[in-house]
Design a protein with these regions (language model features):
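Conserved glycine-rich cofactor-binding loop
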Residues: 7, 12-16
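Conserved glycine-rich Rossmann-like NAD(P)H-binding loop of the short-chain dehydrogenase/reductase
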Residues: 28-44
Length: 92
């Protein structure tokens, strides 16, 4: 699969399934925006993806807040100039 020039926003990507999806998409060339309630978790995953040659950013986001969601989308588009894939993985 080739996801070059595609950008994905993955909620709940600081651990578990969301982290796995983010890592897989990055390995196929996608820019990934890791979104989660705990910034330190998504930052750690983003840093590792970047160190492995991928392109990732981390954003703290509460998916129960429209403002927080909008800020995450705006930050993703600002960084990567697009948003092509949305993975809704966040859970309580």
């Amino acid at each position: 699969m080739d996801f070059s020039n595609k950008t994905a926003l993955i909620t709940g990507s600081g651990q578990g399934v969301g982290e796995g999806i983010a890592r897989a998409l990055a390995s196929y060339g996608a820019n990934v925006c890791l979104v989660g309630r705990t910034l330190s978790k998504v930052e750690a995953v983003a840093e590792d993806i970047n160190q492995q040659g991928g392109s990732a950013i981390a954003i703290e986001c509460d998916v129960k807040s429209n403002e927080s969601i909008n800020n995450s989308i705006e930050a993703t588009i600002s960084k990567f100039n697009s948003l092509n894939i949305l993975i809704n993985n966040a859970q309580e």
